[in-house]
Amino acid sequence: MLSLQTLAKKVVACNYLSSDYDYMLQRFGLWWDLGPIHLCNNCKQIFSYKHLQCFSEDDLCLEAALVKAVKSDNLELIRLFVDWGANPEYGLIRVPAVHLKRLCTELGGLTPVSEPRLLEILKEVAKLKSCAGVLLGYDMFCHNPLLETVTRTTLDTVTYTCSNIPLTGDTAHHLLTKFWFALALRHNFTKAIHYFYKRHKNHLYWRVACSLYFNNIFDIHELCREKEICISPNLMMKFACLRKKNYAAIYYCYRLGASLDYGMNLSIYNNNTLNMFFCIDLGATDFDRAQRIAHKTYMYNLSNIFLVKQLFSRDVTLALDVTEPQEIYDMLKSYTSKNLKRAEEYLTAHPEIIVID
């Protein structure tokens, strides 16, 4: 149950006040980082008065605010954020100083933090899907001695489950850096992307691979504009074709000079017919090679379809000269493959060519 003072602070923080009240807010303990604290009563995000809407890239969930307060040794705000609902266990993850550890324990945090609970918190932070959450996860778990007892197999499993992308790294820190970087790229959290890239310039290849894998062409466009990419378009196409329905990434790679035939054949190898038909819709034509690859990979119905070469043609409704990311996304928003529809109609009309496994 909240004390009267804590409840009063919460009520004040949930309302906007003019700058005339700044001195009072400072004395009231609702001041942080040169500005007043505001708490959104709906989403429980903490943000400053300069942001009039929630979910900006500077918003902090209560747990992220707690960790920041622990790092800055702000005992008053630690108590306040826990009273407002922050989990005190988050304050224990970074192995704080003794007096901070004691305070978080007094406020309800369990110590020592068990390995299952540590990994559960990692997954909780990954699910926040916010810029602040990604940066919080990086701050809490990279170079964290509590992870030294966690086996690499366990850590690999947890990070893959949360990101759906295979990760590699010589150390737990290296692995987790790539993990949080991948989540930032997946959701296009530009502030977090720039934060990671500024500190890890050697991860350019990883940045490009993740952006293409997650269909984030905004980030690829930025790298191209800054002339940072020194990777061949066909190699970029390889990353784009790894995931289903990565139409925008495939289109952007094609605009950079990647071969549509290469993209079509890669998609067959990856057993991804939706990406394959998208490449055909854009103008891929090397059906002889595609037929051989389909047969080699035991996709016999697809192999038989490619024998009917006159069945396929470029979809003229897809413009081939769009370069701006948002325009590409808009163009493909309602995209459906005309060549896929033709193939399905042909198989329905010619059931004799269907191979049943």
From Swiss-Prot:
GO terms for cellular component: host cell cytoplasm. Keywords: Host cytoplasm, Host-virus interaction, Inhibition of host innate immune response by virus, Inhibition of host IRF3 by virus, Inhibition of host RLR pathway by virus, Viral immunoevasion. InterPro entries: ASFV_MGF360 (IPR002595). It is found in: Host cytoplasm. GO terms for biological process: symbiont-mediated suppression of host cytoplasmic pattern recognition receptor signaling pathway via inhibition of IRF3 activity; taxis. Pfam families: ASFV_360. Interacts with host IRF3 and TRIM21; these interactions mediates degradation of IRF3 through TRIM21 and ubiquitin-meditated proteolysis. Plays a role in virus cell tropism, and may be required for efficient virus replication in macrophages. Also inhibits the host cGAS/STING-mediated type I interferon production by inducing host IRF3 degradation through the proteasome pathway. Belongs to the asfivirus MGF 360 family. This is Protein MGF 360-14L.
